[in-house]
Amino acid sequence: MNLPKQLFHWFEQRQSKLCHRQLLVITGKKEWTINAAKALSCNQDIQRVLWVGDDLVEYENISIKDYRSKLGQEYDWVVLNCFSGFRANAAVALSGTIKAHGIMVILCPDLFEWPDYADPEQLNRISYGYQHKHVNSFFIQHLISSFSTNSSVAKLSADRFSGKLFFVDDNLDKERYTEQQIAVQSIRKVAQGHKNRPLVLTADRGRGKSSALGIAAAELMQSTVKTICLTAPHIRTVEQVFFHIKRLLPDELQAPIIITFIQ
């Protein structure tokens, strides 16, 4: 499929150095946007792709209403097919599952047509007692305006690509690990200190809370704490916690560990 050369140059530059997470908006006819996203994902070194809104067998996929089942997991790409419906809550929540250097891809109609698009999710936004009728979406208009004014948003259409690069500053990378170390130390201090002194760990989605819990749990299991109770709305939301526990625990300590899921 023919795509603008500037797009491939943009991806090549992104692969050359660690970049911030970015949004790529692909606009046009439904079939073309889907094929463009599939072609791009095949050309990139991507391990995990989550496709939201279509039942595409070659990718891990969910309907947009099931977005909560993926919270706590990590993906290189999250593709949000807005032709199947758009939910702002889902888009914001799933943005937190994107790994460092990753991309969220939004597939949508041409931007001047999108506000008038008959969104399948519109039925879920109608209050009881009101009849459904198609209306122009002011929120989509606001979203499109945000795309235009935010220089970090890359945009692709059938005949044009525009996008800037946002590399991660070396000092910023060091500060990230410093904050994580403080979080891990705080968790250990609470677990090994006086009883009934809780710790509240807050951060935006996708900023490493689960990773910090996993690192702290592995360190605690090598010292005095042998029983840890972890609660979550879904088993998959704590995958990163157990990933870091297994990564950091010595082999001789992993064998006797018993993990029990209680629902």
Regions found by a protein language model. Give the residues of each.
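Inter-Walker segment of RecA-like/P-loop motor cores
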Residues: 54-76, 228-263
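N-terminal pre-P-loop "Q-motif" helix
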Residues: 2-11, 172-197
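Hydrophobic positions on the alpha1 helix immediately C-terminal to the Walker A/P-loop
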Residues: 212, 216
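Short, hydrophobic beta-strand segments that form beta-sheet elements in well-ordered domains
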Residues: 26, 45-54, 61-62, 106, ...
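Conserved adenine-nucleotide phosphate-binding loops and their immediately adjacent elements
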Residues: 163-174
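Conserved RecA-like ASCE P-loop NTPase motor core of nucleic-acid helicases/translocases
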Residues: 21-29, 41-54, 200-203, 225-241
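N-terminal accessory nucleic-acid engagement/regulatory domains that precede
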Residues: 69-165
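Conserved lysine of the Walker
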Residues: 33-34, 209-210
